[in-house]
Amino acid sequence: METFNFNSLNLKKIKTAIDVGCGNGRHLKSLGFRLSNAKIIGIDQSVQEITKLQNEFSEHICKNQNSYEFLMGDVRSIEIEDNSQDLVICSEVLEHVPNFRDVLKECYRILKPGAV
């Protein structure tokens, strides 16, 4: 079940996207069906979830010429370049993170100016 309405966004120009706190990857899968020729990144602190996603997406049928990268790490300190993402998703994460404002600062830091 999706908890985010991707249909409310204009995704045609999205070429880089990250799901901050991606968990089981449900938003990554939705993006995989909606985007083409995009670099899609998932980051989570759970090594189990990241390992599972790496295995699952290596054979994922909704590739649409997308590339996927999965990072294990702290969502309060994301190892992604400043102003590099067209779309940042952070769904059902903030309530689980101490100092959630640090997560919001990171999301803003990696988001391209004028992006979503």
Language-model regions: role of each:
Residues M1-K13, S30:
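Conserved alpha-helix/loop element of class I SAM-dependent methyltransferases that forms part
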Residues S77-D82:
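Short conserved loop adjoining the S-adenosyl-L-methionine
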Residues E92-V93:
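Short catalytic micro-motifs in class I SAM-dependent methyltransferases
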Residues R26, P98-D102:
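Short N-terminal helix/helix-N-cap motif within the alpha/beta-hydrolase-1
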Residues R26-R76:
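Class I SAM-dependent methyltransferase SAM/SAH-binding core
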Residues I89:
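A conserved beta-strand element that flanks and buttresses the S-adenosyl-L-methionine
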Residues R101-V116:
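A short glycine-rich, Lys/Arg-flanked "PGG" loop and its adjoining helix->strand segment in the class I
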Residues I14-G23:
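Conserved class I S-adenosyl-L-methionine
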